[in-house]
Regions:
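Short secondary-structure transition/capping motifs
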Residues: 44-47, 161, 212
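C-terminal cap/substrate-recognition subdomain and adjoining C-terminal extension
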Residues: 3-22, 27-36, 131, 150-151, ...
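Low-complexity, serine/threonine/proline-enriched polar segments
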Residues: 74-170
């Protein structure tokens, strides 16, 4: 039976049966009509956050190409020095600020740079057992969590990206592949780390928390394959970095097999040698919140006679604009997370797809 005459059939997988049926009918309706669908990546196309997990991987393995002076500049860049909100305290109940954390992190980094990053005087196992590493790890995670809770989201994103400067784009892609492969094999869930009780520094003792681990979502990969199979183009718009999403979305080892030219994500400026700089490339929108809709309007809609996407999928407030912006959008696929996008649950276009928090797999309920 030819594709033209066959019925659309998504793999059953762990889809909610109603969601699967609606998606199949949508593909059937718009097959070969020069239509397109747009998806978020982190916690939508996959379980977990690929940018966050690279941040975690960098810390765990001390993969930086920054000398202490440049590292010190980067972690302070554009970050206000006023005290954080009341809830951001150390274990002694003292409210913290960026300057105190950065001072401690910088001191730790000097030791780590001299003994491992620049000169392998110690093994990775040995350096991880030092008080400096314990302090660095916890305070980096604490700082990372405090930024979006106290300042604009754009600043928090760029702070994370800038830790990759000094690397070429290909080096970042290689690092992303390493990180993905390791994190796909680790347990998912929150990890709590405590800073050194010996090297308390200016910030004192803090606890950092992070959401570790990644999982592939075969149901989403299959959905992308079927959309493409029936002539519906698939686009990714992500608030992670372009190089990271390209690796995960296009490398055949992960099974999504998407097209590089259909990926729109965050980009830093770079030198003529493709070395990343600590400056955002505003030639494209900041692909978060309204920037996702702007990306569709500027770069995607013109290819389709000004029509919006027939299907948009996301999981959080950063996706809300592109989920609600376009009158042509017939289905909103929400990969539901607790407390996220509750305002769209009752939209008649919405499909709610739950996940199992322990396994990261889709939940068919």
């Amino acid at each position: 039976m030819s594709i033209q005459s066959s019925c659309v059939r998504l793999d059953e997988g762990r889809w909610n049966p109603k969601n699967r049926e609606v998606l199949e009918k949508l593909i059937e309706k718009y097959r070969d009509t020069n239509s397109y669908a747009v998806f978020d990546w982190d916690n939508t196309s996959i379980q977990g956050d690929t940018q966050l997990n690279l941040f975690i991987y960098q810390i765990e393995n001390l993969v930086y190409k920054l000398n202490p002076q440049k590292f010190n500049e980067v972690i302070r860049k554009n970050v206000p020095t006023n005290n954080f909100k009341e809830r951001y305290k150390n274990l002694d109940g003292e409210v913290l600020n960026a300057a105190k954390l950065a001072n401690d992190i910088h001191k730790d980094y000097i030791f780590l740079y001299e003994n491992y990053i620049f000169d392998k005087k110690l093994s990775l196992k040995e350096i991880r057992n030092t008080e400096e590493f314990k302090d660095f790890r916890a305070k980096m995670h604490y700082f990372h969590n405090a930024l979006p809770g106290n300042f604009r989201s754009e600043l928090a994103c760029l702070w994370e990206f800038y830790l990759l400067i000094g690397m070429t784009k290909n080096e970042v892609k290689s690092l992303a592949k390493e990180s993905n492969d390791v994190k796909l094999g680790e347990a998912i869930g929150n990890v709590i780390v405590e800073s050194s009780r010996v090297l308390t520094g200016e910030a004192g003792i803090v606890r950092g928390i992070y959401d570790n681990g990644l999982r592939i979502r075969p149901e989403m990969a299959n959905l992308y394959h079927e959309l493409k199979r029936y002539g519906i183009d698939v686009y990714i718009i992500s608030a992670s970095m372009q190089e990271l999403i390209e690796v995960f979305a296009t490398d055949k080892s992960y099974g999504y097999n998407l097209d590089t030219e259909n990926i729109y994500a965050m980009k830093l400026k770079s030198t003529t040698d493709n070395i990343l700089l600590d400056e955002y490339n505003y030639d494209i929108p900041f692909t978060q919140r309204e920037g996702k809709s702007e990306t569709i309007n500027r770069f995607i809609r013109p290819k389709y006679d000004g029509r919006g996407p027939i299907l948009v999928a996301g999981d959080a407030v950063g996706d809300e604009s592109m989920l609600t912006e376009f009158k042509d959008t017939e289905v909103l696929l929400i990969m539901k997370r607790e407390g996220k996008l509750d305002n769209l649950v009752n939209d008649k276009r919405t499909l709610i797809q739950y996940r199992n928090l322990k396994t990261g797999l889709l939940d068919p309920k």
